[in-house]
Amino acid sequence: MFRYELIGTDGGARRGVFHTPRGPVRTPGFMPVGTLGTVKGLTIDQVAATGADMILGNTYHLRLRPGHETVAALGGLHKMCGWDGPILTDSGGFQVFSLGAINKVNEHAATFRSHIDGAKIELTPEHSIEIQQALGSDVAMVLDHVIALPAPMTQVEDALARSIRWAARCRIAADREDQALFAIVQGGLDRTLRQQCASELAAMSFEGYAVGGLSVGEPPEDMYTTTGFTTPHLPADKPRYLMGVGTPRDLLENIARGIDLFDCVMPTRNGRNALAFTDEGPLKLRNAVHKLDTRPLMEDCPCLACRHSRGYLRHLFVAGEMLGPILLSHHNLMYYGRLMQATRDAIEAGEFEAFKNAKLAGWGHEPFQETV
């Protein structure tokens, strides 16, 4: 029912298709984040127009609002939000990290205080799977223990061991044949721990494998290095997903190291704050230099924003018009979607390295090389 088809490789980069009951997911691919069943500011049709094959929903937030039972009563996440393609739901594990001041973690569960009303919520691996099954996502994630980096080795080892045990509990609890389950590799920035975790999780036969616990405070170069020594220990016949990443540079550097799937709020969050991604690098449209600029953000971009001038887009933000965040969110997701399509084409043509280096140069970056 779920199958990863590897079409070709170019160096470490992989071109493939993740086949799901609701349609194929082309890889490398980027998943727009619809935390509460909506990609902020955009309609489902607008999201689809950016080239996305799969979107992401958030288990923790949907558990609180409107509640997973409510989502199920409304026909599941797909019917509720109107998305016909595949949906991936995260497990709530990242909230253990991001809302750490109001959470506690022990072997049994992560205990939350709702950021909405302060209600106590106990999230066990089994309850995380129960919620994701009620939501009806196509891909569920195991519950893991995320920590900030850098961290003491004892803390990294403890979170790693707990994540492996929780993954095993999720594997037992996940009994829907129409829902894939992805494991999450932890281990901080330590090569030995990452490889140990990858090997132990690979033995549990998940439908896909995520690299988690990165983009949590470490320098980008440490992320790239860690991805590079982790992916060789993951099954080649399963999709590889780097969670919560990232900038256009992050995407290309990690694709070079064997990653297939990404998600991040960066395109839409930055779009709501007047920052547009382009081949010239990011443009901050509130800057006065754009006031009289008649050019579009990009000449060849088919998004809604690029029908207008940079000066008009700046005006929308300065005036506080809601159209500004909508247009830039659409542009940024379109930019990410087109970047992924161009990347897939470059891999198939055997030109990925040259493509990556040209893009990085346009953004003002040098290719990253690990030190031996």
Curated annotation (Swiss-Prot):
Keywords: Glycosyltransferase, Metal-binding, Queuosine biosynthesis, Transferase, tRNA processing, Zinc. It catalyses: 7-aminomethyl-7-carbaguanine + guanosine(34) in tRNA = 7-aminomethyl-7-carbaguanosine(34) in tRNA + guanine. Pathway: tRNA modification; tRNA-queuosine biosynthesis. Zn(2+) binds at residues 301, 303, 306, 331. Substrate binds at residues 90-94, 144, 186, 213. It is an enzyme of class 2 (transferase). Catalyzes the base-exchange of a guanine (G) residue with the queuine precursor 7-aminomethyl-7-deazaguanine (PreQ1) at position 34 (anticodon wobble position) in tRNAs with GU(N) anticodons (tRNA-Asp, -Asn, -His and -Tyr). Catalysis occurs through a double-displacement mechanism. The nucleophile active site attacks the C1' of nucleotide 34 to detach the guanine base from the RNA, forming a covalent enzyme-RNA intermediate. The proton acceptor active site deprotonates the incoming PreQ1, allowing a nucleophilic attack on the C1' of the ribose to form the product. This is Queuine tRNA-ribosyltransferase. It comes from Rhodopirellula baltica (strain DSM 10527 / NCIMB 13988 / SH1). The gene is tgt.
